[in-house]
Each structure stands twice: as structure tokens, then as C-alpha cells.
């Protein structure tokens, strides 16, 4: 029967999709572009010159890499930063760091907080306890695919529900008999 169960699903699915989209906006996306390297990406709503990545190793050592830096500054080929515009994301700027593969480390995207540069605010965080947490970079941190899947599922459920209503009506009326 149609009942109220289907109507709840039809209403809840788009809401769940929106929650997934909102949840993914400030999360980090971790993958390995090639053996021995690690790519961490974070989506932001605005760009700022005061952004940097912080890597805290299990030994306690800290490494900081500025997102916007001069070519002559520290970092070189060891840590590469990348900024790109994401047209289908809720937050349109994706900040990425490519660094040597590290396990048992914590990676953070930070911004200088305060008027005079005192303190910092954490925008994204990623913990890398094992290699199982890292996937290959086949799909970038773009939420467009997730959004498309949610839309397709929503329309499929609505179409199935409408078909079910039409089928129930035709069964209730009964088969049509044709007289010759």
C-alpha cells in the first residue's frame, strides 16, 4: 500500500542529500595521486592570504606550509600547494596540499586569526592512522557527483511512487473487459 511511508521517504531523501552536501563542504578529502605522495583537499567559501597547512607527525614534529607563498620560500618540491575553483561545490574554492605519504600524522588547514596575527583558527583537519584511510585520486574533491546521484535517486523514488499510485488505482478499478 501507498500509506504515509512513501511520502516520508520522498520528503526525507532530498533532506538527506542536502545534509550530505552540507557535511561535505568543510570536510577534508584525502587520496594518493601516485605512490609515495598524499593529497589533502579542503573546500572553503573564501580565499585568504593567511592560510597555511600544518602537518603534525607522530614524533611531535610540526611542519607548516603556506598556501600562498613565493617560489623561493621553504617548501619547494617536498610540499606542493594548489588552489582551484570548484563550480559545483557549495564552497567554491578547493585548497590542496600534496606531500610525501605519512601515516600516524594529523594535517590541518589553518588561518591566522585575530587582528594582529595572534592565534589561529582550524578550518579542516585530517587524521591518518593507517594506509587503509587513503584512496587513489580518481575523483577529485568535487561534490557535483554526489549532488547528481542524490538528484537521480530523488527523481527515481518520486517516479516509483507515482507508478505505485497509478498501479494501485488500476487494480482497485479492476480489469477492463471489452465486449464485442
Swiss-Prot record:
Cellular compartments per GO CC: host cell membrane; membrane
Alphabetic keyword roster: Host membrane, Membrane, Signal, Transmembrane, Transmembrane helix
Statement: the UniProt record of this protein carries the keyword Membrane: yes
Residues in the signal sequence: 1-27
One Pfam family it belongs to: DUF2677
InterPro entries recorded: HHV_UL121
Disulphide-bridged cysteine pairs: none
Source organism, top-level taxon: Viruses
Family: Belongs to the HHV-5 UL121 protein family.
Protein name in UniProt: Membrane protein UL121
Gene name tied to this protein: UL121
Amino acid at each position: 500500500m501507498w500509506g504515509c511511508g512513501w511520502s516520508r521517504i520522498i520528503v526525507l531523501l532530498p533532506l538527506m542529500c542536502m545534509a550530505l552536501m552540507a557535511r561535505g563542504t568543510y570536510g577534508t578529502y584525502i587520496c594518493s595521486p601516485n605512490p609515495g605522495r598524499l593529497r589533502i583537499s579542503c573546500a572553503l567559501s573564501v580565499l585568504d592570504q593567511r592560510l597555511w597547512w600544518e602537518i603534525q607527525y607522530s614524533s611531535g614534529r610540526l611542519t607548516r606550509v603556506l598556501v600562498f607563498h613565493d617560489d623561493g620560500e621553504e617548501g619547494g618540491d617536498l610540499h606542493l600547494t594548489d588552489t582551484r575553483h570548484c563550480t559545483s561545490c557549495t564552497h567554491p574554492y578547493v585548497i590542496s596540499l600534496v606531500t610525501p605519504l605519512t601515516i600516524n600524522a594529523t594535517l590541518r588547514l589553518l588561518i591566522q586569526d585575530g587582528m594582529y596575527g595572534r592565534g589561529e583558527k582550524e578550518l579542516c583537519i585530517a587524521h591518518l592512522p593507517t594506509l587503509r584511510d587513503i584512496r587513489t585520486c580518481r575523483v577529485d574533491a568535487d561534490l557535483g557527483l554526489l549532488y547528481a546521484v542524490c538528484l537521480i535517486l530523488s527523481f527515481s523514488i518520486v517516479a516509483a511512487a507515482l507508478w505505485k499510485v497509478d498501479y494501485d488505482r488500476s487494480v482497485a478499478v479492476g480489469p477492463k473487459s471489452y465486449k464485442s
